[in-house]
Amino acid sequence: MNVNKNINNIFFIFAFSHLIIWTLVPTITNKNLPLDTIEALAWGSNLEWGFNKHPPMSAFFPEVFYQIFGAQDWSYYLLSQIFVLISFFYVFKFANEVLQDVKLGFISTILLSSIYFYNFTTPEFNVNVCQLPFWSLVVYYSWRIYDSKDIKFLDCLLVGIFAAIGFLSKYLFIYL
């Protein structure tokens, strides 16, 4: 039990470190926001149900952060990392339940973080980053439905909501 608690603490230290590093480094080193983030901000000022290239959620979330933080570049890097950390958290939970081993769950998350799309490209908030947490959430809650003896309405509802938001994040989400 104590080992599991330590692994959970290590996971949260890892997640917090990831958040700080991947928010701080681009904030310090980049002179401009990435182009996809600028495009999302432009679209966010005039929200519609879709744009000529992408669905609306990649513009909606930056617009929410713009309304909260204003024109602060660091906030959009933070937004990207929040989306990545939600993915990490649900992959960690999913792996813990499927593998029934907290250590293997943590290793799964570390391996996921080594994938290019979960580190070097994440400072640029775009449709690819926007869909990440929804993939993890849909898989996790689908697993809960599959693994449970009695299907809970809330799990079904959450799968539907997260799948819908995921589809509105990137149309290729439908392949899930």
Task: Give each language-model segment a name.
Residues 9, 91-114, 132-133:
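Transmembrane-helix signature of polytopic, membrane-embedded enzymes
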Residues 62-66, 77-90, 115, 131-134:
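Transmembrane alpha-helices of multi-pass, membrane-embedded glycan-processing enzymes
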Residues 15, 105-116, 163, 167:
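Short helix- or helix-capping micro-motifs
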Residues 1-22:
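Start-transfer (signal-anchor) and selected internal transmembrane alpha helices
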Residues 25-40, 50-64, 70-75:
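Extracytoplasmic catalytic/substrate-binding loops of multi-pass membrane glycan-assembly enzymes
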Residues 96-99, 138-155:
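Membrane-interface transmembrane helices that cradle and orient dolichyl/undecaprenyl
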Residues 46, 154-171:
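Membrane-interface alpha helices of multi-pass inner-membrane proteins
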Residues 120-131:
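Short acidic/glycine- and proline-prone juxtamembrane loop motifs at membrane-interface regions
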